[in-house]
Amino acid sequence: MKRTFLNSKIHRATVTGSELNYVGSMAIDAELMKAANILPFERIEIVNVNNGQRWATYVIEAEPGSGIMEVRGAAARLAEVGDIVIIFTYIEIEEPIPVPWHPRVVMVNEKNQISEIRHIAADKPSELLFSL
């Protein structure tokens, strides 16, 4: 049986732009993508901390070191410049689950620069439920 787990997240990034008339996606600074192990065109889930909106889309790579976190397409209606968002990626793992499992969390500052990279750890799968 496969289970879906958090693979990585970019925590509390600031939206730097929105472009409604674009064919969907989210542009993210390539350095942040690399740190969070996110590939171009990978599916992501976004949560807007300011308004509670949650949606899924795919990633487009933005210039490395730019701090860009731009919502594009119809989702531009779900976030405004300056909003705080959390970006999630997930992974499907066949049981038995490797223990410990270590999702990666990329913490950023107000300019979307990496301030810290953490690894959430649990000694057994049941502990994952309480550490996320």
UniProtKB/Swiss-Prot annotation:
One of its GO terms (cellular component) is cytosol. It is found in: Cytoplasm. Pathway: Cofactor biosynthesis; (R)-pantothenate biosynthesis; beta-alanine from L-aspartate: step 1/1. Is synthesized initially as an inactive proenzyme, which is activated by self-cleavage at a specific serine bond to produce a beta-subunit with a hydroxyl group at its C-terminus and an alpha-subunit with a pyruvoyl group at its N-terminus. Substrate binds at residues 57, 73-75. Binds 1 pyruvoyl group covalently per subunit. Its EC number is 4.1.1.11. It is an enzyme of class 4 (lyase). One of its GO terms (molecular function) is aspartate 1-decarboxylase activity. Its cofactor is pyruvate. Keywords: Autocatalytic cleavage, Cytoplasm, Decarboxylase, Lyase, Pantothenate biosynthesis, Pyruvate, Schiff base, Zymogen. InterPro entries: Asp_de-COase-like_dom_sf (IPR009010), Asp_decarbox (IPR003190). Catalyzes the pyruvoyl-dependent decarboxylation of aspartate to produce beta-alanine. Belongs to the PanD family. HAMAP family: PanD. This is Aspartate 1-decarboxylase. The gene is panD.
